[in-house]
Amino acid sequence: MLTIISYFGLLLATLTFTIVLFVGLSKIQLI
């Protein structure tokens, strides 16, 4: 079960990083 929690945490961190990166690129292109 600990592996599932760790995997979910890693997936959540990756998703958050992707969203932040996408928003950052969008703001750069907007300017």
From Swiss-Prot:
Transmembrane stretches, start-end: 4-24
Which keywords, in A-to-Z order, does the entry hold?
Chloroplast, Electron transport, Membrane, Photosynthesis, Plastid, Thylakoid, Transmembrane, Transmembrane helix, Transport
GO molecular function (one)? electron transporter, transferring electrons within cytochrome b6/f complex of photosystem II activity
Upper lineage is: Eukaryota, Viridiplantae, Streptophyta, Zygnematophyceae, Zygnematophycidae
Q: Which gene encodes it?
A: petL
PANTHER family for this protein: CYTOCHROME B6-F COMPLEX SUBUNIT 6 (PTHR37266:SF1)
- Family per similarity comment: Belongs to the PetL family.
Provide a GO biological process annotation.
photosynthesis
Tell me how this protein sits in the membrane: Single-pass membrane protein
Specify the protein name.
Cytochrome b6-f complex subunit 6
| Location(s) in or outside the cell | Plastid, Chloroplast thylakoid membrane
In terms of superkingdom, the source organism counts as: Eukaryota
**Pfam families from the UniProt entry:** PetL
The UniProt record lists the keyword Aminoacyl-tRNA synthetase: no
Q: What does it do?
A: Component of the cytochrome b6-f complex, which mediates electron transfer between photosystem II (PSII) and photosystem I (PSI), cyclic electron flow around PSI, and state transitions. PetL is important for photoautotrophic growth as well as for electron transfer efficiency and stability of the cytochrome b6-f complex.
Provide the assembly information.
The 4 large subunits of the cytochrome b6-f complex are cytochrome b6, subunit IV (17 kDa polypeptide, PetD), cytochrome f and the Rieske protein, while the 4 small subunits are PetG, PetL, PetM and PetN. The complex functions as a dimer.
| GO CC aspect terms | chloroplast thylakoid membrane; cytochrome b6f complex
